[in-house]
Amino acid sequence: MDAALVSELRARYGIEFNNLALLDEAFTHSSYVNEHRELGLRDNERLEFLGDAVMEITVSEYLYKKYPDWPEGKLTRLRAAIVCTKSFSSFSKEAHFDRYIRLGKGEEKNGARARATLLEDLFEAFNGALFLDQGRDAVVDFVSQVIFPKIEAGEFSDQTDYKTNLQEFLQQDGEIEIDYQLLAEVGPSHDRQFEVDVLVGDRVLGSGVGRNKKAAEQAAAKKALEQLKA
């Protein structure tokens, strides 16, 4: 475990992990595990999975309580602007998480330490680890320092959520089921591209490509809106 990380978390956020193995896991990339199999390490992908869900509900609850008069669509748009690659990667860098992630030599050489999708995953993994170690109150306390002040300052109000815009456009005259289908994952692990179609029934409305599924879905929704409004 990096003593500097432990010290910085304590000094900046008042966080002290009970189970340092969880913190260690959160900052261990799969490329590092693959290059050090003899150590029997675990990468942060499972914690990322958990942290993604924890962040979704934490931000959702905050917005629901803070804006009691807002309609669902407006809440969804703001949440999508917060719970996304651009924002999470920014939070990761502000917290200096990029300094402590353990990477394999190949990923380090390819500039992964500055890659937005990796930093997003790292932020989610950290919150997943914090949730397991101390519960959701600890996550809320951390997010109250890192994210909530930015919401109150209006930093996310100008970001566009194309998925919600597409949903509202298509559902003007009633409920319509919209489906996003992953077509392919192409490229090496350090430069993976996801291809997604957005459909209503069997009709493909648009296709998109992105560095993760969320970004690809947004790109597909944007393309669908452009074609529907043409």
UniProtKB/Swiss-Prot annotation:
Keyword Acetylation among UniProt keywords: no
Keyword Metal-binding carried by entry: yes
Class of enzymatic activity (EC top level): hydrolase
Amino acids binding Mg(2+): E48, D121, E124
Transmembrane segments: none
Subcellular location: Cytoplasm
RNase III domain boundaries: 6-135
Active-site annotation: D52, E124
InterPro entries: dsRBD_dom, RNase_III, RNase_III_dom, RNase_III_sf
Assembly description: Homodimer.
Role played: Digests double-stranded RNA. Involved in the processing of primary rRNA transcript to yield the immediate precursors to the large and small rRNAs (23S and 16S). Processes some mRNAs, and tRNAs when they are encoded in the rRNA operon. Processes pre-crRNA and tracrRNA of type II CRISPR loci if present in the organism.
Protein name per the record: Ribonuclease 3
Species annotation: Latilactobacillus sakei subsp. sakei (strain 23K)
Organismal lineage: Bacteria, Bacillati, Bacillota, Bacilli, Lactobacillales
